Design a protein with these regions (language model features):
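Low-complexity, intrinsically disordered activation/interaction regions
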Residues: 90-96
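Interaction-mediating elements
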Residues: 1-78, 96-190
């Protein structure tokens, strides 16, 4: 399949406070806006041209160690997961993504439209995300799957018991590990 302007779009985290939509199809703009509104995050929508628009947040959400609160981190991660799930329902699939939320890396989620869907997209999207130096957030993970993930991590490294947060999230803390660590053991943990 060749990529044409009418069957791709991208969400770009270019700025710590801005999510830009490239090749902004009206149905996709409405979907992204709805998912962000449902997240409870405050943002302004603006359109630069017929093919690009942006959502500017009131807080820095895409910067390492720049979140104003863990709750905001959960909200934006949950919103992005919902965007992926909702896009899938209208036959837009993640083609690839880069490291989301790293300061000044132009993180991106690139979507292509599946013009010949073979299966119905169904099910929820959940998130496993680094948080702080040595913590991880499990967002919207069904209990059975969360237990499997936690058990799998425990086989590799010592961790705290999952702490349930006010939202649909749990936090675990890893002992003697930092996300920025290098080397073979750090890679195996990731």
């Amino acid at each position: 399949m060749s990529i044409r302007p009418n069957n791709y779009c991208a969400l770009l985290c270019r700025d710590p406070r801005r999510l830009r939509l490239i090749n902004s199809h009206p149905i996709v703009v409405d979907l992204v806006r709805r998912c962000l509104e449902e997240s409870g995050l405050k943002f302004e929508f603006y359109q630069n041209s017929n093919v690009t628009c942006a959502f500017k947040f009131s807080k820095h959400l895409f910067r390492r160690r720049g979140l104003t609160s863990e709750e905001d981190g959960i909200k934006i991660r949950n919103a992005l997961a919902n965007i992926v799930a909702e896009m899938s329902k209208i036959n837009w699939e993640v083609d690839f993504s880069t490291d989301i939320g790293r300061h000044l890396t132009n993180s991106c989620i690139f979507f292509t439209q599946n013009l010949n869907p073979k299966e119905d997209a169904s099910g929820n999207v959940f998130t496993f995300a680094p948080s702080g130096t040595s913590k991880a957030l499990l967002i919207n993970v069904p209990d059975g799957i969360e237990n499997q993930i936690v058990d799998g991590i425990k086989k590799v490294i010592k961790i705290s018991d999952p702490e349930k947060l006010d939202t649909k999230a749990s936090r675990i803390e890893m002992s003697s590990f930092a996300w920025y660590s290098t080397g073979d053991s750090a890679i195996s943990i990731r």
